[in-house]
Amino acid sequence: MAFLAMDLDVHGHPDLSRRFVDRMAKGLGDPNLHRLIDFYKSQRAQVRGKVGGLRAAEDEVPLRERARSRAEARHRYQWALRYAVAGSEPLVVVIMGRPGTGKSTQAEAMSRALGWPHLASDRIRKTHAGVPLHGRTDAETRERLYTDTLTETTYATLRTRALQRARRRLGTVLDATFSRFAQRERLRTALRAADVPYVFVELTAEDDELKRRLRRRSAEEATASDARASDFEMLTERYEAPDALEDSRHVQIGTAGAPADTTLEILKTLIRRAD
């Protein structure tokens, strides 16, 4: 049963998967089936991933077929992790925090691990403004990029795209500072109204480390972010840090360690919350 439910999800039919599980729970007289099925779907997805991985490692299998098997194995492992993190629901993972905390690095890692798109405010903002995504912007362009109007348009786009995917029962990773309480509250309100699960993952680091990272970023050309070391005090002053009472669906993760360790800690935290 879990194999079929999982395969229906993977092939783009979550509605049929849900209906199938509903019918089975009713037919078996098992009201707890919905609480258990995601565990077994995750396990079955891992089995499919293992089979694909083994096939991809066999020398006698043609190279093209091995590549397909490798891609299929990766896809199934992503599904296994999705079930562990979000069950069968379309979770919205919001990676937020001050500039320099590693939001884009971790959002991209979450995107790769879960197979969900990474929607970054920096890219959306520049796309709306018709500005090249990478490379430094001059003072005049930066002033145009960070008007209140364009900022609200950028965050509205993040909300809209996350909701559009959630209606199709698909998860999303959002990447933005979310420095204002009002920005977070508008997203929360929209997701709650649509009954979409979400979690804010606030990344943190010591001030000295943030300054060091921003100085390093100032020398880079291939970055979509415009935050620089010279902006640190201004950006810190504008940041309205969430407090413990703002939202129970909020976690803090330190980013002092290696990026891969931070990614693992985020995933473990999300899995613990799902339990």
Language-model-detected regions and their locations in the chain:
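Active-site activation/catalytic loop segments of kinase-like enzymes and analogous catalytic loops
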Residues: 1-28, 42-60
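ATP/Mg2+ or Mg2+-diphosphate-binding catalytic cores
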Residues: 50-98
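Conserved lysine of the Walker
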Residues: 103
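Hydrophobic positions on the alpha1 helix immediately C-terminal to the Walker A/P-loop
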Residues: 106
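Conserved substrate/cofactor phosphate-moiety recognition/catalytic segment
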Residues: 111-170
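Loop/turn-to-beta-strand initiation segments
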Residues: 168-172, 197-199
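Conserved phosphate-donor/acceptor-positioning beta-strand/loop module used by diverse small-molecule
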Residues: 194-214
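Small-molecule kinase domains that catalyze NTP-dependent phosphoryl transfer to phosphate-bearing small molecules
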Residues: 216-265, 273-275
